[in-house]
Amino acid sequence: LSTWLNSNNVSDSVSRLNIGLILAGNIPMVGFHDILSTMIVGHRAMIKMRTNDDVIIPELLEKLTEITPEMSDYYAVVDRLTDYQAVLATGSNNSARYFEQYFSHVPMVIRKNRTGVAILGGDESEDDLNGLMKDCFQYFGLGCRNVTKLYLPENYDLNKIFSASLP
């Protein structure tokens, strides 16, 4: 973590802010990076969990607080965001429109749906295709950066893709 902080020129003299975090809930613990990034630079993470991912992160934060009790000053798991000076929210393209309007009075970063694209040349190895299929199907394809679109050369042998997608 020190190497990461030092390589990103994070100042020790940051004014502490309450940062509202609306976490994605499509993959377990997908929002932990946002929490860690907020806390490690000295801000307080005001965490709004998604109902389908509201167990592991609170348990992890509780365990981390048992190890380092002062950590409790750097986060709060909340049902509703209040008293925040900036927001980082992740959601669908539709919810992003709502977030942009609702949080327009503070600095914000709003993440929307994203997708990954793979362009194949036709000379990929079996290992390459196995890795590609892992990326397509990891987390049941729910990750915002999972490959969801393939561009294939004309007359590509689709059996290569089908074989790589089977366990």
Residue ranges and their predicted role:
Residues 18, 68-150, 154-156:
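Conserved NAD(P)+-binding/catalytic subdomain of aldehyde/semialdehyde dehydrogenases
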